[in-house]
Amino acid sequence: MTNIFLYGTLCDRELLEICLGRSLDNVKLLNAELENHSVFWVKNKNFPVIKFNRGSFAKGLAVLDIDDHELERLDFYEGGFNYELIKSDIMLKNNNFYPLNKKLQAYVYFNNDEKFEIGKDWDLNEWQRRYGLISRLAAKEYMLLKRRCREIDF
């Protein structure tokens, strides 16, 4: 089982369900932060990037205990955008069942493309209003591709 810290589009619960391939009813989702990082829009794009930023805290969600199949699905989705997992220490925040400020190791998707020009601070609500619907529809099609690739042993 693996812990993942999400900070961008996958904090949209509908998109996360599509990518995991199941309902979030039994998924442990907790508020969390990654210290010394901030999340920004990529300039002139519809997605975010996380960057080192001393003294800042990137807010997001910790997804606890996902299995290998779910991790493979997330990797497929994020890999299409040149993101890779790096293990980091995160801090759980303001959760009912876990102590406040509990440190935890989790994997974080970092983008490898240093050519991206950073835009303004990321805003999930803005993304949901402007791009959420079309992004979810595209994700459904893209995740179907994963199943088709597996069927032909690709």
Where are these regions (language model features)?
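Glycine-aromatic micro-motifs
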Residues: 1-154
